[in-house]
């Protein structure tokens, strides 16, 4: 392996500072939240103004109306069948099963529709806007026609020497960074640290354009957050000023899990000094092989390209057709505290699992977006974009492969711009960007295998460094932020000497 490898020990779980619940209000410019509690109760409410456990139920009057509608429509259907289909077609009475079975089906369907509409009305009434669900330290800005929610932390003293943009993983939001890592990173690096919600998650807007949910858009947002962080030391009223009187700080992008794809895309566009990938999902486990970074790969056969085009187009159609059912399924699981407690406890290492399961504030931090209007539509669009990249984008990409196969050329030659978010092209752009890469991975990660990061570090070459955190699972920056911050500080500090040293030079 060409990359450097380091193994970070894990300190005792009980001694860790960040296991205390995060207060709803924190100082956006000053760094750490004020007066955090040292213990967390399972009954602690992180967002007392939001009804995270709301479950819509029908009132007795609504039940009565539903049953009455079911009986009425069933009777109408029975009369319709008896008169139009039986007497006119056969001249006699119909068997009971010809009338009763369809009538019952119509009655049940009518009641189901009534129940859905009644519960949907209650569901929509309890949802709030992104700004109503925001924290006092929440900030919003517009990037590429998307209103992006983000959190900001900066060092308590002096202008930032480093600016950091953090991208969360699938199903998460800024909470995964702000609870444990943002303030310590700001102090350790002397950095302005920004974490944003990706489109479809958290409190960021959920546009109808599926291209806004692709990694290229999230990468553009990550780069925009670097610009926001660059002027973070100014007053909040002047944070949008495009220029700073201070020298340009070092630019760092971080990405956890699927957020690592956005971080890699952001760095691949250039003007990024360091990249920190935390349990990155850049190389899917199903591939089982090293990514092909050859800019001129072996041409794809015509049959393979055609099958791929038809397969992805069929997938797009199927996902669109199943979207309403997917929304109902997401509502069932995402709002459940039990779902998050079990999921988070399985995602982390063995020693952290009891804390993530018993402390309800962790689950609340992840499921808060389920109180925002349109959150389920956003999740469906995320899945649609991931599965199809949009029907038009799928067809364009696969058509390019077919055309290249017919010419017996490399598909990479004529691939559209969206194909740059493919793993191979993204990694190639990252490798050629000149940015140094730190990969942090827990040795108990059950979601993204550690071997994936080993192969990724090997593929990126000597500029990549792999740090393995013992006893951590898929979320090492949340499980052991002290060790994580120390690893990042050592990595960034190698090329970022303190400004006081540089100031002494004439």
Feature map (PLM): residue ranges:
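Active-site loop/oxyanion-hole signature of alpha/beta-hydrolase fold enzymes
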Residues: 59, 154, 189, 195-254, ...
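An N-terminal hydrophobic leader/cap segment in hydrolases
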Residues: 90-140, 506
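Flexible "cap/lid" subdomain of the alpha/beta-hydrolase fold that forms the substrate-access gate
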Residues: 91-98, 102, 114, 213-215, ...
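Gly/Ala-rich beta-loop-alpha elbow adjacent to hydrolase catalytic centers
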Residues: 255-259, 263
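Short beta-strand/loop motif that positions the catalytic acidic residue
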Residues: 439-441, 445
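Catalytic active-site module of serine/aspartate enzymes centered on a nucleophile-bearing elbow/loop
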Residues: 454-455, 462-506
């Amino acid at each position: 392996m060409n990359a450097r490898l380091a193994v970070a020990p894990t300190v005792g779980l009980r001694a860790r500072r960040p296991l205390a619940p995060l207060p709803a209000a924190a100082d956006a410019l000053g760094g750490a939240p004020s007066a955090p509690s040292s213990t967390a109760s399972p009954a602690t409410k992180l967002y007392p103004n939001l009804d995270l456990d709301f479950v819509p139920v029908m009132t007795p009057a609504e039940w009565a109306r539903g049953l009455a509608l079911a009986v009425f429509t069933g009777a109408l259907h029975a009369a319709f069948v008896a008169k139009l289909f039986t007497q006119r077609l056969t001249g006699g009475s119909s068997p009971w099963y010809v009338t009763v079975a369809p009538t019952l089906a119509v009655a049940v369907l009518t009641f189901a529709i009534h129940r859905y509409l009644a519960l949907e009305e209650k569901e929509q009434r309890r949802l709030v806007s992104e700004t109503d669900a925001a924290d006092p330290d929440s900030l919003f800005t517009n990037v590429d026609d998307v209103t992006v929610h983000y959190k900001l932390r900066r060092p308590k003293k002096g202008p930032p020497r480093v600016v950091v943009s953090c991208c969360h993983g699938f199903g998460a939001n800024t909470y995964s960074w702000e609870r444990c890592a943002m303030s310590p990173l700001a102090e350790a690096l002397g950095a302005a640290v920004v974490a944003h919600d990706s489109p479809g998650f958290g409190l960021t807007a959920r546009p109808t354009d599926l291209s806004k949910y692709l990694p290229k858009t999230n990468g553009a947002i990550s780069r925009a957050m670097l610009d926001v962080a660059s002027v973070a030391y100014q007053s909040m009223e002047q944070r949008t000023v495009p220029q700073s009187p201070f020298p340009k700080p070092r630019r760092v992008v971080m990405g956890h899990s699927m957020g690592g794809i956005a971080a890699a895309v952001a760095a691949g566009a250039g003007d990024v000094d360091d990249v920190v990938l935390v349990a990155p999902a850049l190389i899917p486990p199903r591939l089982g092989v090293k990514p092909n970074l050859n800019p001129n790969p072996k041409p794809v056969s015509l049959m393979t390209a055609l099958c791929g085009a038809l397969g992805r187009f069929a997938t797009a159609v199927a996902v669109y057709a199943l979207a309403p059912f997917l929304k109902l399924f997401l509502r069932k699981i995402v709002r459940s505290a039990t779902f998050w407690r079990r999921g988070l406890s399985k995602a982390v290492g063995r020693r952290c699992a009891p804390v993530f399961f018993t402390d309800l504030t962790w689950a609340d931090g992840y499921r808060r977006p389920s109180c925002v209007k349109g959150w389920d539509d956003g999740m469906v669009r995320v899945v649609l974009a991931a599965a199809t990249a949009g029907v038009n984008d799928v067809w364009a990409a696969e058509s390019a492969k077919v055309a290249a196969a017919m010419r017996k050329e490399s598909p990479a030659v004529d691939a559209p711009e969206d194909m740059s978010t493919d793993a191979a092209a993204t990694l190639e752009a990252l490798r050629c960007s000149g940015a140094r890469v730190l990969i942090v991975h827990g040795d108990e990660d059950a979601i993204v295998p550690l071997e994936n990061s080993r192969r990724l570090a090997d593929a990126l070459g000597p500029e990549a460094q792999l740090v393995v955190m013992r006893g951590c699972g898929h979320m090492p920056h949340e499980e052991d932020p002290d060790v994580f911050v120390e690893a990042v500080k050592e990595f960034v500090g190698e090329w970022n000497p303190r400004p006081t040293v540089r100031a002494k030079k004439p």
